[in-house]
Amino acid sequence: MYYGDPRKPDLKKEDVKGSSRFKLFFTVLSVRFWQLIQLNLLYAVFWLPSYIWLYIQGLLMQQTNQPVTLEFFILMIPCLMLAGPATAGVTYVIRNWARDDHAWVWSDFKDAFKENWKQSILMMLINGIALLLFSVNVRFYGSIVSEGFFYLLLYYFMFILAIIFVMMNMFVFPMIVTYRLKLRQILRNAFILTMVKLPLTFVVFALAGFLMYLSLVYLLSIPFFLVGLTFPAFIVISYVNWILDKYINIHLDEEKEETEGEETES
């Protein structure tokens, strides 16, 4: 049972049982809308260091007319790591809501935060290092593109590689909070799942990214703190739930049924 707007009746399982993914998405969104705002306010606290550092860097760029410095990316790494466990907590709560399961905003967030903090921090460390490396390579190849077509290809290849890596993150955190796997296994599976449905994954990524960009235009203002994080996350995780059900969970269910059948026979 769901707990949403007190003026609306509670949403029961039979209300969405057998529904299409789209119907389930909009039904759950309408009921969980205010809780998504609550979760967004909680999640935004852990992104404050990143917001502040990004804001400072923006001011420096306006004053000096200089591009983003390497120091910005280096200092961004610990800011990202701080948001890692909170990302796991938010992912767990939204994952449950998106697949028609119940989750409390604070208690389930806290439990997932505590249970997955190690892998989450490590993943954000990897993200920070990857961000630094991509920026260095893009600058390097961008400075020598005039020397040959090969360097131009490498320049655009780095952009493509960066986009694929970001899309992999769409799958990483849902798998961290769902399966007991080592991080290297999660990254491998995330790459495979990204490539399996690459066009559709890119559409979802672009939509979520566009919504986050709209809220970032109003940096440190109401839109970002209310819906700028959890609403795009709800879109992404709803899609990821479908992919995981289609390619992973269905096989886990089959193995579970076979195991239960063997135990019954014995």
Where are these regions (language model features)?
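Membrane-helix boundary elements
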Residues: 130-166
